[in-house]
Amino acid sequence: MRPKTVLMLLTNAYDPDPRVRQEALALIGMGCRVRLLAWDRDLRSAPVQVMEGVEIERVFLASAHGRGTTQLFFYAWLYLKMLWRGLRTSFDVVHCHDLDTLPLGFLMGKLKRKPIVYDAHESFPDMLDGSVHRAVRRALVHLENFLIRRVDLLITVGEKLRRHFEERGARHSVVVGNWKRLAEFSRTNEENLAVRRGLGIPDSGLAVVCITQLLNDRKIEELLQAVEALPNVYVILGGKGVLEGLVTEAAARNPRILYVGFVPGKQIADFTCAADIVYYGFDPANPNARFSAPNKLYEALAAGRPLITGDFGEIADVVRAAECGIVLRVYKVEEVQKALAILEDREIRSAMAANAMRFGQTSLNWEKGAEVLYREYSSLLPGALQEPSGEKPLQLARVGGTRN
């Protein structure tokens, strides 16, 4: 029997997108063939490529992020190009990543009479708040309301967002979070110490990791100012964005601010495991904050590291429930300093780290995500899938493993 083909639609070039990669590899592990139509707006990647078994076909259409309402014209042309390629492709399920691929995937699925999966990585209309005309945002909400009532499966990243879609009429919705493979965050003490020493962090120093987009809403300046008065605290800061100049200047002034530039996937785990604390900053006033369940949360849980975060979204709920970090009342320099001072206490930090690791191993890890995908795709493709082998839970000393 030929393997069932899942056609994924994506509006980035897949370099690779971490969430899309995890889901694609899981489906391949279940015996599916995964084909991916991706938009390369920078015209830099290969037109056809196979990465880890994922068959990628890129659609070239030059554009830029952040165009606002004028991006609609580029989407119209993109849809025509993708529709032509998609209809020439044999597939058994169409899997639409985010709202900007859903209308196209919905049309393809209906024309070919195949199941349609909507994978909502976030609340897309909320993400666009302030960057497109209000009428466009309202239209997107109405469009999404129409489509979520008619797709076969809605997957999203957290329970709060899943309930939000359910209240708006989604027929069948499940959570597959941005959960991490525990094995990818497994490090020995020696490996972690090697990373720390390579960065010039003393064994006795308190290392905070913050790998993110360097944007104004990520509360980076508050962290940088907070550590100035804490001589034992070091910050491993990675990413690209509009604040790169500010971060570079801060690192030049303060040798305890270690700017490592853009960080590829594997190195995120290296730095997270080598650190003592994970910092996540985001503007609570952003409409998407109420649903926030970011990668940083699951990276910290997989590595067994306490978190410092703001009081919003699913991330705050998890940190409180698991007792695995500190939820800031507000993002102010003084509040960040208080949190760091608390976590300088080895006993408190070790207890929170153990809680993070336990919660990650038992509740929010990629083994659980693969199980959900298998269950849901088995109902879409009866009798066609192999059960995933999964990951065995790792010993506490092995996951993340350095000083706490």
Which functions belong to the PLM regions below?
Residues P47-Q49, A135-R138, S186-I201, G390:
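A short helix/loop element that forms part of the nucleotide-sugar donor recognition site in Leloir-type
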